[in-house]
Curated annotation (Swiss-Prot):
Function: Catalyzes the two-electron reduction of biliverdin IX-alpha at the C15 methine bridge.
Name of the protein in question: 15,16-dihydrobiliverdin:ferredoxin oxidoreductase
Superkingdom, taxonomy of origin: Bacteria
Annotated GO biological process: phytochromobilin biosynthetic process
Pfam families, alphabetized: Fe_bilin_red
InterPro entries for this protein: DiHydbiliverdin_OxRdtase (IPR023658), Ferredoxin-dep_bilin_Rdtase (IPR009249)
Keywords linked to the UniProt accession: Oxidoreductase
Organism, scientific name: Synechococcus sp. (strain WH7803)
Keyword hit for Magnesium: no
GO molecular function, one term: 15,16-dihydrobiliverdin:ferredoxin oxidoreductase activity
Gene transcribed to yield this protein: pebA
Catalytic activity: 15,16-dihydrobiliverdin + oxidized 2[4Fe-4S]-[ferredoxin] = biliverdin IXalpha + reduced 2[4Fe-4S]-[ferredoxin] + 2 H(+)
The protein's Enzyme Commission number: 1.3.7.2
Family assignment from sequence similarity: Belongs to the HY2 family.
Length: 241
């Protein structure tokens, strides 16, 4: 279901000079003898980003998942990029979340970084789901303009591909604008490097405590592996708490 999305994401990473980085041993791939599903993960070093992770779960008609989070360098205070796509084939159900995940909810910060996502929010009204994601506080690490959809095959085949491409383009444009400002000798950030580091670490801690996918991974790949995956790969800063 999500192979074309994965290819598009990796293509953009390669075009931006991304290089593979080491995934913690034993976490790059896992096969479930119980469900027959498999999970593969990639870690990328991309100019302007300190960490970019990608995960693809393939459990056939039962479940398909694509997840990715990009963490900008600490010298850049712009939002993290968050992608969560889930397809439950037996029920023909799509859950999609695409967001620029803000480090803070300050109005000036939102005005500086979210014009591109605001435009997508207007362009794709079918992905403007107002339903709150139950595991998270929408006012923390999620933007008011996230693209969110609970739909079916029509949304998965028609709305989502165009929205995904436009979303990646908008995020790259925001990132490029920040790099251009930095190259001109002016700081693109209003938050200090220490503040960005602290807030990105807090994001990991917050997300690890609430990640709804942890139970899903546990059901497929067991508790021990899934606990390691949560704290060592998905949200590594949560290990220090």
């Amino acid at each position: 279901m999500f192979d074309s999305f994965l290819n598009k994401l990796h293509q953009g990473i390669h075009q931006r000079g991304g290089q593979p980085a080491a995934v913690p041993e034993g976490l790059e791939h896992c096969h479930s003898s119980k469900s027959g599903g498999s999970i593969d993960s990639w870690l990328w070093s991309v100019p302007g980003f300190r960490r970019w992770r990608v995960t693809r779960l393939d459990a056939g008609e039962s479940l398909q998942v694509l997840n990715s989070v990009a963490y900008p360098d600490h010298s850049l205070d712009h939002p993290l990029m968050g992608v969560d796509l889930l397809w439950f084939g037996a029920r023909q159900k799509l859950v999609a979340v695409l967001d620029f995940q803000p480090l803070i909810q300050d109005q000036d910060y939102l005005d500086r970084h979210f014009q591109g996502l605001k435009a997508l929010h207007e362009r794709f009204p079918e992905l403007n789901g107002e339903e709150t994601m139950r595991s998270f506080d929408p006012n923390q690490y999620f933007s008011p303009w996230l693209l969110f959809c609970r739909g079916g095959a029509q949304e998965a085949e028609e709305s989502l591909p165009a929205a995904f491409d436009a979303f990646l383009t908008a995020y790259w444009a925001m990132h490029d604008q920040a790099l251009d400002v930095e190259a001109a000798g002016t700081s693109a950030s209003t938050l200090s490097i220490n503040d960005v580091e602290r807030l990105q670490e807090a994001y990991d801690v917050y997300s690890a405590e609430r990640d709804p996918a942890h139970g899903l991974f546990t059901s497929h790949f067991g508790k021990d592996w899934s606990d390691r995956f949560l704290h060592e790969f998905l949200f590594p800063a949560s290990q220090s708490t």
